[in-house]
Amino acid sequence: MSVARHQRSPELVGMPLEEILEKYVGRFRDKAADWAAFADAKIEGYRRAQHRFIGAGGSGKHDDPTIIPPGNFTLSIVYVEPGQGNAAHTHEVEENFFVLQGFLDVFIEDESGKRLTTRLGPWECICCPAGVIHGYQNDSLAPVYVQIMLGRGKPETMGYADDKLYERRDQHLKAAE
């Protein structure tokens, strides 16, 4: 007989294993590519598709019925075509980019505009600390799949460094209503 050495979360107490397995498994084949996941995603140069697995990530789409309920982090897979990326931004928690396929140029930046960039390949990552301006660009000739994790179950939407994008950072959520 097995012994659980830690208590289940309150919402799982009494839940049969079959229901837990059904609720907490996510499959890529069941995830629709969301090309409007972020406020900047319709702007040329920032087009990308989010596949939400655990929580909504920085998209703010926390009511997505297809996600695994988040606890203390989120996990998404983002598809980035050549020439695309995301706008410089911050989060209130750390954000991790883990490249699964392709090559991705990631950057960190300070308020003076100084930017440092490095290229990540498959099975390489960067952890962007809270409050540090960061982002990525696919400057290669092939698509990229990158796993993105945020260190909070329901993080705020992206804190864009650009004032105009920041003012509209929730606009994509209102358009979906």
Please report, for each region that a protein language model flagged, where it lies by residue:
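A short, N-terminal "cap"/entry segment at the start of jelly-roll beta-barrel domains
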Residues: M1-N72, K164-E177
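Double-stranded beta-helix
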Residues: S2-L12, D110, G135-E177
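Conserved short histidine dyad/triad with adjacent acidic residue
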Residues: A56-D63, T74-H91, A130
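Short histidine-centered beta-strand/loop micro-motifs
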Residues: D63-P69, N86-H91, I108, T117-T118, ...
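His/acidic/aromatic-lined binding-pocket segments of jelly-roll/cupin-type domains
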Residues: I77-V78, A88-H89, E94-V99, T118, ...
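Glycine- and acidic-residue-biased ligand/ion/polar-headgroup-sensing regions
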Residues: P82, V93-E95, V99-D105, E109-D110
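Histidine-centered metal-chelating micro-motifs
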Residues: Q84-A87, D105, I126, A130-G135
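Short acidic-glycine-tyrosine-enriched beta hairpin
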Residues: D110-A130
